[in-house]
Each structure stands twice: as structure tokens, then as C-alpha cells.
A protein has these predicted regions:
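Hinge/lid segment of periplasmic solute-binding proteins
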Residues: 104-158, 167, 185-190, 198, ...
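Alpha-to-beta junction loops
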Residues: 74, 92-103, 116-118, 199-201, ...
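Conserved N-terminal structural module of periplasmic/extracytoplasmic solute-binding proteins
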Residues: 2-17, 21-114, 125-131, 173, ...
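Short, solvent-exposed loop/beta-turn-alpha elements that line the ligand-binding surface or hinge
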Residues: 118-133, 176-180, 203, 225-248, ...
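Extracytoplasmic/periplasmic substrate-recognition and gating elements
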Residues: 42, 65, 69-70, 75, ...
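C-terminal capping/gating helix-and-loop segments adjacent to ligand/active sites or protein-protein/ligand interfaces
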Residues: 383-400
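Short helix-initiation/N-cap motifs at beta->coil->alpha
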Residues: 79-88, 106, 182-186, 263-278
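Glycine-centered hinge/linker elements that transmit conformational signals in sensory
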Residues: 186-193, 233-265, 309
């Protein structure tokens, strides 16, 4: 074996260079996203930035200008990338996701577990937002008491109904309010009465794409179905159960026993609203923003109502969903601070003149489009929020 003598000074230089290289690479691994620009401002890259010219892009540019004027230590860097499962995890592993990115409730827990979202708890408290948040919504984006996402939209599924068809079927109370099916069996009875009285499908249940499974989830839960259970460090599918079979049997009976579904049972997200919006179906499981989905079918807002979802034999439950902003796990403390400040420009519990102007403009636009605006959706903020109080008062005032 041959040994080569290396000059001590040269060895020291090589070791120093090696240490510096490791240090630099380590820094890249910790945070591959540039923290500051040439002017020393903290960079906040924001995903889902509109790429096409138009109102949406202009609104974002205006918001960006206001933010940078009011927060001179930060600069917004637009990023056109939007969340999708095919690209997210590869980009996240490489530290290539923007500082602020958006996704939905269904992806949050997996992203948190993978470690790709920053802990926002301290910053939310520092900026006075934590105690103003709706605790039910906050639970969805939390793990071990820490918050890893900023929920900005939330909904719960309820039961939409056609007022005119309910009236024709004798399903209205003397005070003009609708009778409400207390459980799924009574919903089937209501649907039968409606079809006999009007010839129209009493109930609409989607089956195509991923919508059928989404809507079926709340029905199955109410029958006592557990879709998965934790088995050690893994999750095990458990929906192959008598409870799930019973829930599926109810859906089958709607078609073959009660005959209250539309003749076309291949119904996706768009088709369900088309069926309801054109008066071809009387009831539909939907979220509170459903009236906006039927506006293109010229349905009179006075004909649309929302009520709570019926209970099942085991539970009275519904499904909650929504959208969130997450902050990259590569974000520095300054970037987390700036990210929350940026998000707050559009979603704040505080009642500002800008918020008033935006809400009034939004609701008046929806009224012009003949949309129903009386339905109050689930909110990120608790009932003590001044912004929520204003929004509810405005809806009550302009109710159509």
C-alpha cells in the first residue's frame, strides 16, 4: 500500500475548503429559497399568481402594490405554479415550492405529516389572529396543538331544496318555512311526494368523477362507517364494513325502491347543478355557496333554500371542507412574518374600510348576477370578529 505525504498547510487548506463546502451545501439544504433581494427586503414568493392578463391578475397586482407600500421591508415575488399532487411533493423535496402556496383541507394533514408546511402558531399569535380564529376550522390545520396552515375559506355540506317544488308537494309549514327531513328515510319519503306531485326527481345524487364519493362520505359517516383506522404508524382502510354497505343500500334504494333519482344517473359536479338549476330535481346535498353554481341556469333566487343535512341511524354529521394557504417549511422567520401579513391583506378578522368596500362590491355584483346571497357560509373567524358581524349584517340587509 502506498502512502503519499501531504504538506500540512495544503492539508489545512483542503480541510477548510471542505468545511466551507459542507457549510454552503448545508445552508442550501436548509433553505434553497432566497431570503432577501438586492435592497435587503425579505422576499415572499406567492403561488397561484394569475398568468393571464385580466381582472384577477390586476387585482393581485393592486394588492401587491398596496402591501409593498405598507410593508417596505418585504417584496412580493409572483409564482404562477399552483398546487397539484403530481408536482407538489417533488418540488417540496427540492425546496422549490413558493413561500405561500394554496391547497385544500383534504391535503393538509398529509402535507403536515410530510413536514412541508411551516409552524405558524407563534406568528398568528404575535399578529393577534390566533384567538380570533374559528376553533373548529383551526383543528383541521393543527397537529399536536400547533397550527400549520391558514384557512381562508370553509364550508359544511347541507341540503339544498327547490322552494317551488316543495310547495307543490305540500311540504311547507303554515308560516312559509319548509318542512325538514329529520333523517334519510324521511328524505326518501319527501322525494316520493315531490315526484308524485310534480313528476320531477325528488333527489339528486352525483355518481361520476370524484363527486359521488365526496358526497357519499357524509352519508356513510351517518351510518357509522369508519373509512380508516390507524394501525401503528400506518393507516388501514376499514370501509369494507356492514355500516358502509347499509349506506350504499340506501343510495341503491333511492333508485330502485323509491325511484326518486333522475333518469340519467351519470351525474358529475356540473350536471348535478344543471339538474337542480333547471328545476329537474328538488333536493341536493351541497355547500352553502351552491347558489353561485346554478346562476347560469337562470334559477330564481327565491326558489332556492338551504337546510341542515338529515341525520343517519348512528350519527348526525356532515362534511366540512375548505381551502388553506400554507407556508413553505423552508421559510425563514422573517418570511413567515411577511407571509402572514400578506395573507392578512385579503383575509382579516378586522373591519377595515377596504374590507367594507370589497364586501359591498362583491355582494352587489352577485345580486346583479341574480345570485342568492342570504346563505352564510362557515367562516375562518369566530363569531366575535367585526368583519364577520359586518358581513352577516350586510347579507341580512340586502337579502333577496
Amino acid at each position: 500500500m502506498e502512502f503519499k505525504m501531504i504538506n500540512a498547510k495544503r492539508l489545512l487548506a483542503l480541510l477548510t475548503l471542505s468545511a466551507l463546502t459542507v457549510s454552503v451545501l448545508g445552508a442550501c439544504g436548509k433553505n434553497s429559497i432566497n431570503d432577501t433581494d438586492e435592497n435587503g427586503r425579505t422576499i415572499i414568493s406567492v403561488g397561484s399568481w394569475p398568468s393571464k392578463d385580466g381582472a384577477k391578475k390586476q387585482n393581485m397586482e393592486d394588492r401587491r402594490q398596496r402591501f409593498e407600500t405598507e410593508n417596505t421591508d418585504f417584496v412580493i415575488q409572483p409564482d404562477n405554479w399552483s398546487f397539484d399532487l403530481k408536482s407538489f411533493y417533488a418540488k417540496a423535496a427540492g425546496g422549490q415550492i413558493p413561500i405561500v402556496y394554496s391547497t385544500n383541507f383534504t391535503e393538509v394533514s398529509q402535507i403536515i405529516s410530510a413536514g412541508y408546511s411551516a409552524d405558524l402558531t407563534n406568528e398568528l399569535k404575535k399578529q393577534g389572529l390566533y384567538d380570533k380564529m374559528n376553533k373548529e376550522v383551526l383543528d383541521v390545520v393543527s397537529k399536536d396543538g400547533r397550527v400549520y396552515a391558514f384557512p381562508y375559506a370553509a364550508y359544511v355540506l347541507g341540503l339544498a331544496y327547490n322552494v317551488n317544488l316543495f310547495e307543490k308537494a305540500g311540504l311547507m309549514n303554515e308560516d312559509g318555512t319548509p318542512k325538514q327531513p329529520k333523517d334519510w328515510n324521511e328524505l326518501a319519503e319527501f322525494a316520493v311526494k315531490i315526484k308524485k306531485a310534480t313528476g320531477v326527481a325528488g333527489f339528486i345524487f352525483p355518481t361520476a368523477s370524484n363527486v359521488g364519493g365526496w358526497i357519499f362520505t357524509s352519508v356513510a359517516w351517518s351510518y357509522g362507517t369508519e373509512f380508516m383506522k390507524k394501525d401503528g404508524d400506518k393507516w388501514k382502510a376499514t370501509f369494507d364494513s356492514p355500516e358502509a354497505a347499509e349506506a350504499l343500500r340506501f343510495i341503491k334504494d333511492l333508485k330502485w325502491k323509491y325511484d326518486v333519482l333522475p333518469s340519467n344517473t351519470f351525474i358529475d359536479y356540473t350536471e348535478q347543478f344543471k339538474t337542480f338549476g333547471t328545476g329537474q330535481g328538488a333536493m341536493l346535498i351541497a355547500a352553502g355557496d351552491m347558489p353561485g353554481d346554478v346562476r347560469s341556469y337562470d334559477m330564481n333566487p327565491d326558489s332556492i333554500g338551504m337546510m341542515m343535512i338529515p341525520r343517519g341511524p348512528k350519527e348526525h354529521v356532515t362534511l366540512m371542507g375548505g381551502s388553506v394557504h400554507e407556508v413553505s417549511n423552508k421559510a425563514s422567520d422573517n418570511q413567515i412574518e411577511g407571509a402572514i401579513k400578506w395573507i392578512k391583506t385579503a383575509y382579516s378578522p378586522d373591519l377595515t374600510e377596504q374590507f367594507k368596500e370589497n364586501r359591498e362590491k362583491d355582494i352587489n355584483t352577485r345580486l346583479e348576477n341574480n345570485e342568492l346571497i342570504t346563505v352564510k357560509s362557515m367562516s375562518t373567524w369566530n363569531s366575535e370578529s367585526e368583519a364577520i358581524k359586518f358581513d352577516h349584517e350586510l347579507r341580512d340587509k340586502l337579502a333577496n
